[in-house]
């Protein structure tokens, strides 16, 4: 069971490592503001006229980190939902691990755009008073926990196991 859980977790580990790298880069410098300004130039420029550069940079940093964390939590939730029924793919003669990786790969590809959209929205929704952003409202968007789980991808058994069970039930019924 550990080996199987490891196999399913490997894709998520690689995705997490990439997001952690992006997150750390955004925390260390002006990368967060650059990303948001590239994604929504007019909106970020307009906000920049209302608040100072340092304030905008810190707000972009907090908004992007909160969006990354929320998106990752949602991504893990999607993975958990997918894992709940992945064993049923065996009935369609599909490899559950391959199908899991396909679906989670597609989901991850859309994550970057959603993160930027959410971060820009959070930054623009933050209250501005006296040329300052309410940075505390941005920090409250950061999720406080994630979770881990184990899974089996073939709890119904392979074709021969299912046929054997059916045969045993049939023979037991005739005795």
Language model region names:
Residues 1-175:
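Extended, charged helical/alpha-beta scaffold domains that provide interaction surfaces
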């Amino acid at each position: 069971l550990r080996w199987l859980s490891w196999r399913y977790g490997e894709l998520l580990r690689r995705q997490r490592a990439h997001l952690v790298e992006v997150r750390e880069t955004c925390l260390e410098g002006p990368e967060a503001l650059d990303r948001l300004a590239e994604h929504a130039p007019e909106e970020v420029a307009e906000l920049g006229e209302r608040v100072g550069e340092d304030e905008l940079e810190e707000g972009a940093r907090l908004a992007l980190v909160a969006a990354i964390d929320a998106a990752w939590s949602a991504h893990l939730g999607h993975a958990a939902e997918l894992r709940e029924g992945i064993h049923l793919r065996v009935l369609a003669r599909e490899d559950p691990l391959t199908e899991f990786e396909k679906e989670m790969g597609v989901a991850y590809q859309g994550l970057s755009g959603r993160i930027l959209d959410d971060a820009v929205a959070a930054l623009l929704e933050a209250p501005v008073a006296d040329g300052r952003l309410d940075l505390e409202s941005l920090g409250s968007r950061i999720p406080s926990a994630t979770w881990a789980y184990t899974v089996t991808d073939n709890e119904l058994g392979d074709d021969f196991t299912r046929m054997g069970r059916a045969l045993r039930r049939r023979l037991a019924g005739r005795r």
